[in-house]
Structures are given as structure tokens and as C-alpha cells.
Curated annotation (Swiss-Prot):
The keyword Transferase applies. Homodimer. It is an enzyme of class 2 (transferase). This is 4-dimethylallyltryptophan N-methyltransferase easF. One of its GO terms (biological process) is indole alkaloid biosynthetic process. The gene is easF. Belongs to the methyltransferase superfamily. Gene3D superfamilies: Vaccinia Virus protein VP39 (3.40.50.150). One of its GO terms (molecular function) is methyltransferase activity. Its EC number is 2.1.1.261. The keyword S-adenosyl-L-methionine applies.
């Protein structure tokens, strides 16, 4: 079976800007690390293992919704749609939707977007494209912003109906203010054009605010190597910038995984889960490559947040984003739901 096509839509190379983002985050207060640092190929392998653990309810619930409601969700997608999947690291979940579209003989174009070229190739290789006649597949190598620009500006794409998939609770990784801005940006790029009345966003949100359930989900097996792998990746990126002939001993980079541990916390005031790295033994000097930044013992270097949305917060998110809620798909006892959103 021939390899599915991959289109490079990158406006710039993320790897080139990540070292600057690392330094900027570590010199800020509170200290942070950029989320993209955690999604190297090795990081994604650890995350995929972690997300399959029994206590990690978000993935399990989302799969149940797509498995049971796939036909109804597929019916909400217009014929001839361009489906842009902004979270395509694993197709197991969305596969139920694609199979439903095929069963309905609905001709659509599915584009899996990923920042990692190797991960994208792996994802596309797993698609049994020979089983599909009505759903056609391709990959997009780039960032969220690259994907939105592409769907808005590509002549043969921009006037077709669009369906943007934002599953995997991705919107929860943004602050509430930034989530509204990002969702509005998606709407402005993908829900406009000649077929805007037929275009939509399919968004998953988590409403669970039970601290024990949430923290148990984000401390299940696989999350620690996922978190610590980012330090190895950061060091590799920084060392790659060293010019030949420069003594590497002069330019030190102290990002040893064994010197750090992972912290999982529930923030009651903000209604979010917080994931951080903390020095294990004492103060850590990060070395000359990182401007000799000192991370104090017990000081948190935050790298991820997962916001949970109750009904009032969800309504405000949609209002601030300029979108209207249409259909909602969930199951009894589920904290996760998938929302159909249209331009207001």
C-alpha cells in the first residue's frame, strides 16, 4: 500500500525556536517549560502508554463517546468537507468517526496535523486507507497556527465545508482567556468562506472537578518518564546549537532527569490540574547554556495545566469565542463531552 501524502506547511521550524522558548520560560516567574518540549517522539510514546492506563479516564470516556455516537457525529459533518484534525497523534479515537463517515458514503478529505514528522508518518501508516473509498487521507506537518492558515488560504480548500477536530481535551491546556482566544482564532480561520454555514468545530471538554479522580488520572503509570524525557530533549536541542570548535565543558547544561521529580496538583481556585518538575535534592544551577539560572529546592517549574469546565465556564468560553453550541454528545456518567460549535 503506497504511503499517504504529507504536506509540509511549516512557516518556520519549531526546533529552531524551542531553545529560546526554554530560556524565556525558565527566566520567567513562575518558571515554566514550553509544552511542545514534551511531545518529542519519545515523549509521545510515554504519553500514549500513560493515557491507556485504567485511571486515565479522559481518553477512555472520549473513545466511548466516539464509539457509541460516531454515526450521529458523522451525520453532523457536511458532504465534501475538509476535516482538519488538530490532535492526530493517535487515530484510535477518531477512527470510529472516520468509519461512520465511510459507512454513510460521505465523501470527505481528512487531514491529520502534527508538529512531529516521524509521529505523523507513524499515524498515517496505521490508517487502513484501502478500506476507505469515500474518506481520503493526507498529513499536514506543522503547528496549529500553520494548519489554520493553510485551511483558510489554500484555494482548493478554503471554500469547501470545514470541520475542525479539537479532541483530546486540547483546549484545556490553555488558560481560560487564551482558550477563548484560540477557539475564536479557529472560528475566524475555519468557519468562514463560501461554506461557512456548513462548517463546524468538534471540541471535547472535561467537567470533572473531583481532585482525587483528576490527580489519580495524571499520576498513572507512564507520566513520570513522559515528564522527565523533556529534560533530555531540551538538553539535546541546546547542545545542537553549540558551534564546532567551542569547548563544551565551558558551556554546561545541567538538565539531568535523575535530579528532578514530577509533581501533580489540583488547583482549587483555578479549577485546573497542574503538572510541574521540582528539584529532587536541593537547589539546581542549570548551567551556562541556560544563563546559570538557579531553580530553588521545592521551586516548581510548571509545564502543563488541564482546565476543567463546569456549565457556567463552558458558556463563557463559547460566548467569548464567538461560537454557538449545537449538538452535544456524551454518555451517562461521563465527565467528558463533545460539542458541535458553529460561528455565532
Amino acid at each position: 500500500m503506497p504511503a499517504l501524502p504529507v504536506i509540509d506547511i511549516r512557516s518556520n521550524h519549531v526546533e529552531d525556536s524551542l531553545p529560546e522558548q526554554i530560556i524565556k520560560g525558565l527566566t520567567s516567574q513562575p518558571k515554566t517549560l514550553p509544552p511542545l518540549l514534551f511531545y518529542s517522539n519519545e515523549g509521545l510514546e510515554h504519553w500514549n502508554h500513560h493515557s491507556r492506563q485504567p485511571d486515565f479516564y479522559p481518553r477512555r470516556q472520549e473513545i466511548e463517546i466516539l464509539k457509541q455516537g460516531g454515526n450521529d457525529i458523522a451525520r453532523s459533518i457536511a458532504p465534501s468537507s475538509v476535516i482538519l484534525d488538530l490532535g492526530s497523534a493517535n487515530l484510535e479515537k477518531v477512527g470510529y468517526l472516520l468509519e461512520a463517515l465511510e459507512a454513510q458514503e460521505k465523501d470527505v478529505l481528512y487531514f491529520a496535523l502534527d508538529i512531529s514528522a516521524p509521529q505523523l508518518a507513524t499515524t498515517l501508516k496505521e490508517i487502513p486507507s484501502s478500506n476507505f473509498r469515500h474518506v481520503r487521507f493526507a498529513g499536514l506537518h506543522g503547528t496549529f497556527e500553520d494548519g489554520l492558515r493553510w485551511i483558510n488560504e489554500t484555494p482548493e480548500i478554503r471554500d469547501l465545508p470545514h470541520c475542525v477536530l479539537l479532541l483530546g481535551l486540547t483546549i484545556g491546556n490553555f488558560s481560560r482567556q487564551n482558550a477563548a482566544a484560540f477557539l475564536q482564532n479557529i472560528a475566524n480561520h475555519a468557519l468562514t468562506g463560501a461554506s461557512k454555514n456548513k462548517s463546524s468545530i468538534l471540541l471535547s471538554l472535561d467537567s470533572c472537578k473531583v481532585p482525587t479522580k483528576v490527580t489519580r488520572a495524571y499520576t498513572s503509570d507512564g507520566v513520570v518518564p513522559f515528564a522527565l524525557q523533556a529534560l533530555t530533549y531540551a538538553k539535546a536541542l541546546l547542545c545542537d546549537r553549540i558551534d564546532n570548535g567551542i569547548d563544551e565543558k565551558v558551556l554546561s547544561c545541567n538538565l539531568r532527569p535523575e535530579h528532578w521529580h514530577y509533581l501533580s496538583e489540583w488547583n482549587f481556585a483555578l479549577g485546573r490540574h497542574e503538572a510541574s518538575l521540582i528539584p529532587r535534592f536541593g537547589d539546581v544551577c542549570l548551567g551556562s547554556m541556560l544563563q546559570d539560572i538557579i531553580v530553588k529546592k521545592e521551586e516548581k517549574v510548571r509545564f502543563a495545566c488541564s482546565y476543567k469546565y463546569d456549565a457556567k465556564e463552558r458558556q463563557k468560553l463559547f460566548l467569548d469565542s464567538g461560537v454557538d453550541q449545537g449538538m452535544v454528545w456524551t454518555n451517562e456518567g461521563c465527565d467528558v463531552a463533545i460539542y458541535e460549535l458553529k460561528l455565532a
